[in-house]
Amino acid sequence: KEKQLILEACCQHDFGKANLIFQAVINPELAEKLNLKPRKVKQIPHGFLSGLTISKDEFLRKSELFTVKDFLPYMTAIYYHHDREDRYTPAEIQEWAERYYLPQLKEYTGEEHKELYATYIGRLLFRNDPTAMRKVITPEMRNEYLLIKGMLNKFDYAVSAGYAEAELEPDLIKKELKASVERYLQEKELRPAQQYMKEHKDENLIVVAPTGSGKTEAALLWLDGEKGFYTLPLKVSSNAIYKRIKGRYEYKNVALLHSDSLSMYLQEASEESVDQRQNRAKMLAWPVTVCTIDQLFKFVYGAIGTEIFAATLKYSKLVIDEIQSYSPEIIAAIIYGISIIQKMGGRFAIITATFPPVLAHFMERYGLLEGKEYQRVDFSADTSIIRHKIEIRDSEMDPEELLEQGSKKKVLVICNTVKSAHKLYQVLESKTEKSW
């Protein structure tokens, strides 16, 4: 049913462009022939007109799968498929459409249209008018609207940009990224977090594991070749993960998306058009996208034009890394956003070194119940990972020993006084250029 709703919306959403004023604007010869001055005539947005052309009964006859509850999400998606302020009354739209739209509609569609249905405008899920009364709509109707509107925009943007496909080919069959990660890890035993996420690839997860436990690779194994978004709080972190996927794992179908991602594409100087790569990233078309969280969660504020993010996340996997780094305001948006994504059918994995218990409390308030909507597992007690070795010396430091240790790993030396630290540094500096 969802596919059918999206297809029907794609077919109907631009009917309104058949109106005489729009045609006269794009075709000056027509305007001259009809002695029209279209720039002096008030225009009604074509999306508003497209929504007038079908009644509830006609809508239900389009598919036996459609129900009365589908009609208003469908109509609202068509009506506002562009972000246009709506201060017209149904009567004003009806009068304008009867004069400039209805006569042209038959020529455009090849079908007889005797009536326009402006009365449905007052029943839309919402009006893009700050003075209009806000309605209470069910989560089911809201999510259906998000899906129809989001996918309609996604297809519309792709076609307008000259692309035949709205999505680049996913990695579902070859699973090249997963295979590359597995090759990289083949000489090592999978760490607990990696093994767990690989085995629970079809579930929503919260995985707590210490720094250095291979959470990034665990998340890539969890993606399992499906369309995925890997989110981080900082641009520099996003750049690092993007480089790791593209470099270490030699996976080319990965995109980077944040406020400064264009500079990264320019640095790469690839044969592919930089603009094209950036535009496809903005359209959420790549199989794997590394991005900052703000690039995806705009839809939680309900702004028209952001539905594409929720609709795309419905059939994607979302990785949220370093959730502890966000401010309370962003945490609130993330929790609300994943509650919507989960209800729509998308999947999420939160990977973190620290997961404050209060987050689980607020997730539960939004219907995200541990053990039902997601599984939580904590590997922070894993003592197999030794990141630092500390030794206290009562005697003078031996520069030769430090140089030997420094040839194998990083060594941090803390002295009692500035004078002794400076003296030791001078000795080391005279023997190696790698001292700081």
Enumerate the language-model features and the residues they cover.
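Interdomain hinge/linker at the junction between the two RecA-like core domains of SF2 helicases
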Residues: 357-407
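Post-DEXD/H (motif II) to motif III coupling segment of the RecA-like Helicase ATP-binding lobe
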Residues: 307-317, 322-379
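Conserved strand-helix element at the start of the C-terminal RecA-like helicase core
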Residues: 227-238, 405-429, 436
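Conserved Walker A/P-loop ATP-binding site and its immediately adjacent core
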Residues: 225-249, 256-261, 355-360, 418
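Accessory nucleic-acid engagement/destabilization modules that flank
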Residues: 1-174
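Conserved pre-motif I regulatory segment
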Residues: 178-206
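Inter-Walker segment of RecA-like/P-loop motor cores
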Residues: 252-302
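Walker A/P-loop
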Residues: 201-222, 326
